[in-house]
């Protein structure tokens, strides 16, 4: 449900990546183009894979199986995957497109639908396999191993996990302070304003960097309706948002006009960390590099 909530809205607004920018020490943007995935050498495989599960295409690419991917979901936007056909409309699978590609394997997760499309693919005698979703740093390794098992590349999966684990450890450094962070999910035109709580995904990133996700400490569910009272009570030092979300409310100036924002420490100091929509909660081969960028940004905001 969480994945459907986030991705369904992201699909409508994903666009080209922005260059990384720092307007001043308090406002930092991390773009998709500024973060590189960890990749293994490309290998030959006879598999024909349609990757529909969130982040699966990116992991397959990093396992060295880019040439085996014959179809992908619209959320897989990294440059390496650009030439691969999209087989979804928004977040809805188009069964006819999938079947026409004659895949030997279709990878899905719990968020993929509609069920009728998946059933049609199965009726066409095509293997459909479901993998676990990743909502925190610990889930990444399980997801990579699950995909590695499906494609008979267990050794490659273990190697990739080892490289990512090493890079994740190296990404962490002393921030020099323990910032209180609030993650806001914003979609202005759709009037969607949510504050992240425990299990939003952002809490795992913030905690790994040595910060405190205030929403995760004080709220009960992954995503909660944003209120001025909740923001003022949380009183974060830094706001974490998605880049398109920030744009959707009119950029920094519009963001500061949202109820309660200007009354917080983060609002007063304009400490806003924005991250590309396809990157922030991707939890995959780009995550270690993302953590490095986030660490650098939070240090600069001290």
Identify what each model region corresponds to.
Residues 94-111, 126, 227-244:
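Proline-aspartate-enriched helix->loop->beta-strand connector
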Residues 2-57, 150-184, 243, 296-302:
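Bacterial Sec-exported substrate-binding components of ABC uptake systems
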Residues 73, 198-223, 243, 274:
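His/Asp/Glu-enriched short active-site or ligand-binding loop at hydrolase and phosphoryl-transfer sites
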Residues 76-80, 115-146, 150:
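Flexible loop/hinge segments that line or gate small-molecule binding clefts
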Residues 116, 132-146, 178-201, 247-250:
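Extracytoplasmic ligand-binding site segments that recognize negatively charged/polar headgroups
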Residues 33-35, 85-96, 218-228:
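Short helix-initiation/N-cap motifs at beta->coil->alpha
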Residues 30, 47, 139-152, 158, ...:
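Structured C-terminal subdomain patch of bacterial secreted/periplasmic proteins
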Residues 47-101, 105-112, 211-214, 247:
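A short, structured surface patch at a secondary-structure boundary
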């Amino acid at each position: 449900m969480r994945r459907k909530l986030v991705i369904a809205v992201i699909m409508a607004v994903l666009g080209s990546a922005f260059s990384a920018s720092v307007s001043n020490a308090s406002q930092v943007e991390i773009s998709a183009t500024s973060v590189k995935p960890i990749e293994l050498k490309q290998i030959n495989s006879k598999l024909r894979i349609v990757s529909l599960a969130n982040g699966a295409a990116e992991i397959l690419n990093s396992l060295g199986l880019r040439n085996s991917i014959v179809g992908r979901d619209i959320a897989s936007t990294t440059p390496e995957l650009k030439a691969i056909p999209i087989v979804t409309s928004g977040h809805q699978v188009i069964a006819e497109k999938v079947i026409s590609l004659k895949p030997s394997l279709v990878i899905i997760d719990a968020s993929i639908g509609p069920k009728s499309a998946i059933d049609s693919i199965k009726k066409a005698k095509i293997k459909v396999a479901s993998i676990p979703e990743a909502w925190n740093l610990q889930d990444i390794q399980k997801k990579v191993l699950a995909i590695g098992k499906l494609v008979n590349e267990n050794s490659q999966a273990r190697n990739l996990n080892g490289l990512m684990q090493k890079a994740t450890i190296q990404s962490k450094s002393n921030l020099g302070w323990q910032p209180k962070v609030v993650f806001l999910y914003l979609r202005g035109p759709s009037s969607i304003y949510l504050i992240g709580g425990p299990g939003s995904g952002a809490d795992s990133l913030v905690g790994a960097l040595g910060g405190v996700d205030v929403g995760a400490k004080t709220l009960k569910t992954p995503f909660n309706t944003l209120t001025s009272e909740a923001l003022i009570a949380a009183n974060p030092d830094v706001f974490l948002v998605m880049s398109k979300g920030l744009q959707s409310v009119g950029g920094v100036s519009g963001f500061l006009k949202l109820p309660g924002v200007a009354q917080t420490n983060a609002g007063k100091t304009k400490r806003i960390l924005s991250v590309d929509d396809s990157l922030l909660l991707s939890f995959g081969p780009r995550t270690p590099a993302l953590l490095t960028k986030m660490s650098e940004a939070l240090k600069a905001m001290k």
